[in-house]
Amino acid sequence: PFTNGEPFVLYNVKSSVTPLKGGAGNPVMRGNELVGLSASCDPPAQKVLAVTHTMISRFLEQARTGNYIGFPADGTQVTELTDPVFRKFLGLSETGGGFYVVKLPVYGSFYKAGVRPGDVVESVNGIPLDSKGLIKDPALGPVSANFLFRDSAKPGDTITLDIRRKGKDGSSQPMTLDVKLDRSAIEGDLVNPAPFISNPPYRIYGGLV
């Protein structure tokens, strides 16, 4: 199983061996193959959240080339569409899938491509979403749609979104948008979400800045 509330897909591992407290960075093996690295653990419950092999491979690839470009950052906040009353309000059918866009930064890649708050994303690159915003990956099984535009994509890649937008008459109109992924949701933020990546432009010495 996978978590669906994280920026990236994580393995949710149940282990018969009690994980070490604070055991981040421990290997997660399947057979004789490395499939992940632990990010956090819950020893009493014998559960571990682990970074996937996909992300590990991306970091290793960029380390070899010396060209770190990171992962796309869209900054989009979404919610699932399991409530039939909410679906009816949006002009959607009782069945079907997708996720509802709650809000997104105006400097992010999704907004620049035309996505707006209130839109419903029904598929990514032609892959349909269920009502919880999950896709059926042939190798990983049910996984968050984030996997398609965060985990497995690179800045500069283009994805295609099939969306629905509620019109003034209350009906839901289909649209197709192409999104060129980038990191503008981070780079355009006034508050640096990752201050540890670079040194601050000041020095504190003896109480003086």
Task: Give residue spans per PLM region.
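C-terminal, low-ordered peptide segments at domain boundaries
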Residues: 132-133, 153, 160-209
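Solvent-exposed coil/turn segments that connect beta secondary-structure elements
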Residues: 1-2, 33, 40-42, 54, ...
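PDZ domains, with a preference for the canonical peptide-binding region formed by the helix
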Residues: 53, 123-162
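Terminal peptide-recognition signature
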Residues: 24-32, 37, 48-52, 59, ...
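PDZ/PDZ-like domain segments forming the peptide/carboxylate-binding groove
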Residues: 14-27, 79-123, 127-130
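Active-site region of chymotrypsin-like
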Residues: 1-46, 50, 97, 102
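Extracytoplasmic
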Residues: 6-10, 23, 46, 71-73, ...
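PDZ/PDZ-like peptide-tail recognition elements
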Residues: 58-100, 186-209
